[in-house]
Amino acid sequence: MTNIRKSHPLLKIVNNAFIDLPAPSNISSWWNFGSLLGICLIMQIMTGLFLAMHYTSDTATAFSSVAHICRDVNYGWIIRYLHANGASMFFICLYIHVGRGLYYGSYAFLETWNIGIILLFTVMATAFMGYVLPWGQMSFWGATVITNLLSAIPYVGTTLVEWIWGGFSVDKATLTRFFAFHFILPFVIAALAGVHLLFLHETGSNNPTGISSDMDKIPFHPYYTIKDILGVLLLILTLLLLVLFSPDLLGDPDNYTPANPLNTPPHIKPEWYFLFAYAILRSIPNKLGGVLALVLSILILALIPLLHTSKQRSMMFRPISQCLFWTLVADLLTLTWIGGQPVEPPFIMIGQVASILYFSLILILMPVAGIIENHILKW
């Protein structure tokens, strides 16, 4: 008799995705972050659901309702901080996951890669709208500044911004719709993640060498289930250390001041995980140019499969590309630092140099390195 997990219509799907899935025998810990992202998403949906039970999306009571959650709701403080810091863990995993894809040439799976880019945009939109909900100073001014960027679009810009706001400024209508979108988008993300996995399982996972591993596959369970559990435990440990010892480490003190449209904070900045893009936006003096650079800083990922010039898929055996990859990582860290600094010398110049370097590395230097490495192979 066939095992029920192989015959039952529902269990069969789970079996083919998480139990009997043929996986390469040599994938490293960099491959753990997909499952960690799944755990982060589940955790964010669960904590978010409980927060939504007590939150009110009204400008008069939103700030107080968050304070009420932290003070009066049973374990409300831990739910709130798990949700806020869970977003940070989500983005750490997300950026490592994308970085792994870049390093090992996983972008060769075009459908998986492109859905991943759509997922990245959706998660960023969700996180941005979530940051607006506590209705502190940085929530309000962040929402005002970022939505205002759309006014740079010629002809329809101003109309578009007022349409998103639901009025002539960020107000009650904006907060209500942001809450509605912030609630629904994680479920859209979950559906997209399902499609992401569906396309990945059509081809099978890549591996560090970038060479086909069809002749050497092992079952996902127990080998990678146990490996993923270790990753999950480390993720939860890190998150709990953050939540229980310094929950406000990654937040902005300005967000503990209720939103006031008449008082602008000295430095308006988004959460740390958007600072690199914010730095690129600010480094261009023209508004429309800045907005285009901001969008392209993420959308450039879609060009990466077209810019692949090397005969090898992975960077494992390509030292020049490796140097450029880690330069890119250092450059992104520099941009993240600059995004949190005031707009004054020398930060302006550092930001502009780092922005130019970011686009140069991806569009020019890395493809050229691939061609050089192809020639080195002939020697």
Swiss-Prot record:
Recall the GO molecular function terms of this protein's record.
metal ion binding; ubiquinol-cytochrome-c reductase activity
Tell me what topology the record assigns in the membrane. Answer: Multi-pass membrane protein
What cofactors does the UniProt entry give for this protein? heme b
Any idea which positions bind a ubiquinone?
Answer: 201
Keyword field: Electron transport, Heme, Iron, Membrane, Metal-binding, Mitochondrion, Mitochondrion inner membrane, Respiratory chain, Transmembrane, Transmembrane helix, Transport, Ubiquinone
Query: Which free-text remark accompanies the cofactor?
Result: Binds 2 heme b groups non-covalently.
- What InterPro entries does its record include? Cyt_b/b6_C (IPR005798), Cyt_b/b6_C_sf (IPR036150), Cyt_b/b6_N (IPR005797), Cytb/b6-like_sf (IPR027387), Cytochrome_b (IPR030689), Cytochrome_b_C_euk/bac (IPR048260), Cytochrome_b_N_euk/bac (IPR048259), Di-haem_cyt_TM (IPR016174)
Cell compartment(s), UniProt: Mitochondrion inner membrane
Any single Gene Ontology cellular-component annotation: respiratory chain complex III
What are the BP-aspect GO terms?
Answer: mitochondrial electron transport, ubiquinol to cytochrome c
| Transmembrane stretches, start-end | 33-53, 77-98, 113-133, 178-198, 226-246, 288-308, 320-340, 347-367
Q: What protein family does this chain belong to?
A: Belongs to the cytochrome b family.
Q: What else is known?
A: Heme 1 (or BL or b562) is low-potential and absorbs at about 562 nm, and heme 2 (or BH or b566) is high-potential and absorbs at about 566 nm.
Q: What does this protein do?
A: Component of the ubiquinol-cytochrome c reductase complex (complex III or cytochrome b-c1 complex) that is part of the mitochondrial respiratory chain. The b-c1 complex mediates electron transfer from ubiquinol to cytochrome c. Contributes to the generation of a proton gradient across the mitochondrial membrane that is then used for ATP synthesis.
Self-association state and partner proteins as the record states: The cytochrome bc1 complex contains 11 subunits: 3 respiratory subunits (MT-CYB, CYC1 and UQCRFS1), 2 core proteins (UQCRC1 and UQCRC2) and 6 low-molecular weight proteins (UQCRH/QCR6, UQCRB/QCR7, UQCRQ/QCR8, UQCR10/QCR9, UQCR11/QCR10 and a cleavage product of UQCRFS1). This cytochrome bc1 complex then forms a dimer.
PANTHER family, from UniProt?
CYTOCHROME B (PTHR19271:SF16)
Quote the protein name from its UniProt record. Cytochrome b
